[in-house]
C-alpha cells in the first residue's frame, strides 16, 4: 500500500483536477442559470458538486408543502427529481431550502470529452449530462406550473 501511495502522489494530477473542476463548474453554472431564470434563489457554486437553492419565491406554502421536507418529497413524487431538504444540513426546516447535487453523469466520458477539446457548455451538457439537463428541465416546468 505504501508503494501505491508513493506512485499516486508522485504523478502530476493537475490536468485531471483542472478538468474535473471545469466540468463541475459548467454543470453548476448551467443549473444556476436555469433555476434562477424561473425565480429560484440559488447560491452559485464556487466549487464542489452541489448548490443550495431557496424555493420560497416560487412555491407557496400549503397543507401539502409546508416545509423543506414536504417540498422535496412533493417534487420527488411529482417528477422524480431528488434533492435533499436544507434542514438535513442544519438549515431551518420551515424555509423552503434544498441542496441539489449534480453528480448523475458519466465522469469518465465527461473527462475524455473535456480533455480532447473545450466544448461549449450547452453541447457538453447535452452529450455528457443528459439526465441532469432533463431533471432541471422537469424541475423548471414543475415550478412554472405552480
Describe the residue ranges of each PLM region.
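PLP-dependent class I/II
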Residues: 1-146
Amino acid at each position: 500500500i505504501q508503494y501505491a501511495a508513493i506512485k499516486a502522489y508522485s504523478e502530476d494530477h493537475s490536468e485531471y483536477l483542472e478538468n474535473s473542476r471545469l466540468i463541475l463548474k459548467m454543470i453548476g453554472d448551467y443549473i444556476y442559470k436555469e433555476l434562477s431564470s424561473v425565480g429560484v434563489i440559488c447560491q452559485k457554486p464556487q466549487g464542489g458538486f452541489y448548490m443550495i437553492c431557496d424555493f420560497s419565491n416560487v412555491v407557496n406554502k400549503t397543507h401539502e408543502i409546508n416545509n423543506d421536507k414536504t417540498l422535496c418529497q412533493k417534487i420527488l413524487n411529482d417528477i422524480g427529481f431528488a434533492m435533499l431538504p436544507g434542514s438535513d444540513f442544519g438549515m431551518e426546516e420551515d424555509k423552503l431550502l434544498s441542496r441539489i447535487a449534480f453528480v448523475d453523469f458519466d465522469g469518465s466520458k465527461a473527462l475524455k470529452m473535456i480533455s480532447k477539446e473545450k466544448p461549449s457548455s450547452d453541447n457538453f451538457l447535452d452529450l455528457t449530462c443528459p439526465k441532469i439537463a432533463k431533471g432541471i428541465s422537469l424541475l423548471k416546468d414543475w415550478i412554472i406550473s405552480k
